[in-house]
């Protein structure tokens, strides 16, 4: 049921799913099926590698990376991992000792990985965001917002809907309207009906609400401030586009890596961090206050920009070529 099992074949590539799952850290007894699935995944990975005969195997940190890269290494195939977060997951830490190269998105990763293998490449982002040619006026028009909008808040509730962020926005719609804030609100599918009902009750608020934003380039260009979870790719986009942001890390991710990502920015003045537990009370009031301080927003965006690594995909490809001896 995972998205890639549908989208990868549609893009013209074969995909093989592995039955591997993560460990249950609260109830070790539930890990017996996990061990069985790991063995199945190793067997399937070995068969797939033998059939496909790749020149290199690349892992991006998910549990499925472990059996694939382990079997590739046994077969003498070069391996590379990419760590997207500021705090690596268990899989990449286990694989790091035997891979050829480690591409990272944050500085100071020597505490987790062998220093001689680390290359700072950044995280690849969507091509339409790397090469934007959109004016703010065009972006505002795209969302059918008033042309004079000068305090635009972009809220990214996630494709599935981050309930805490959405609830925080919903409970402060009148405050946003009274502060003269214009809202672009991506709710995710699970929250869109509730959000539309709430918006209808505050007609004085200038707002574009949708479950999914197709043109994120327009959304980022329009925004004066972004509210988002702290996933690796969202942060990479925010940094590359030099956007000031308030990050609300999801508490429901392995090893709390979103909090660590957000702290990596907040300690450098590149974002503000509000915890999920604090969000309903603090998130929108702080956003309203921040939008009244354009100079501080500019400074925050510039600090975020210093953490960006443009052309990350090209950097990673270059490392692949080096591992394969195609480029030195």
Language model region names:
Residues 76, 217, 224, 242-244, ...:
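A short alpha->beta transition loop at the rim of the catalytic pocket in nucleotide-sugar-dependent
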Residues 1-37, 42, 189-191, 276-277:
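Conserved nucleotide-sugar phosphate-binding/catalytic loop shared by glycosyltransferases and other
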Residues 296-310:
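A short, well-ordered alpha-helix in the C-terminal region of glycosyltransferases
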Residues 7-11, 134-226, 258-262, 267, ...:
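Donor-nucleotide binding loops and adjacent catalytic segments primarily
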Residues 54-56, 221-236, 243:
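Acidic donor-binding loop of glycosyltransferase active sites
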């Amino acid at each position: 049921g995972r998205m890639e099992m549908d989208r990868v074949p549609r893009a013209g590539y074969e995909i093989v799913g592995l039955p591997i799952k993560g460990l249950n850290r609260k109830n070790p007894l539930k890990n017996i099926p996990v061990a069985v699935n790991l063995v199945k995944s190793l067997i399937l990975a070995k068969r797939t590698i033998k059939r496909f005969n790749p020149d290199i195997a690349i892992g991006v940190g998910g549990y499925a990376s472990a059996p694939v890269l382990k079997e590739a290494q046994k077969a003498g195939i070069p391996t590379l991992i990419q760590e997207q977060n500021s705090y690596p997951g268990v899989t990449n830490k286990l694989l790091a000792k035997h891979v050829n190269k480690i591409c990272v998105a944050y500085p100071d990763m020597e505490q987790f990985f062998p220093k001689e293998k680390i290359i700072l490449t950044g995280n690849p982002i969507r091509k339409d965001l790397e090469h934007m040619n959109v004016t703010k006026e065009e972006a505002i028009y795209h969302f059918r917002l008033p042309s004079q909008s000068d305090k635009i808040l972009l809220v990214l509730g996630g494709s599935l809907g981050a309930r805490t962020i959405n609830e925080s926005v919903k409970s402060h719609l009148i405050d946003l309207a009274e502060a003269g804030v214009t809202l672009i609100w991506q709710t995710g599918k699970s929250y869109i009906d509730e959000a539309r009902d709430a918006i209808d009750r505050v007609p004085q608020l200038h707002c574009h609400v949708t479950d999914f934003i197709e043109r994120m380039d327009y959304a980022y260009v329009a925004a004066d401030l972004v509210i988002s979870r702290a996933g690796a790719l969202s942060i990479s986009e925010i940094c590359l586009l030099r956007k000031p942001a308030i990050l609300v890390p999801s508490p429901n991710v392995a090893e709390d890596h979103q909090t660590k990502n957000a702290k990596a920015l907040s300690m450098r003045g590149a974002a503000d961090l509000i915890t999920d537990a604090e969000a309903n009370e603090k998130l929108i009031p702080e956003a309203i206050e921040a939008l009244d301080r354009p100079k501080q927003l500019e400074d925050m965006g510039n600090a975020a920009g210093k953490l960006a690594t443009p052309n990350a995909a090209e950097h990673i490809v270059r490392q692949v070529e080096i591992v394969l001896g195609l480029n030195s």
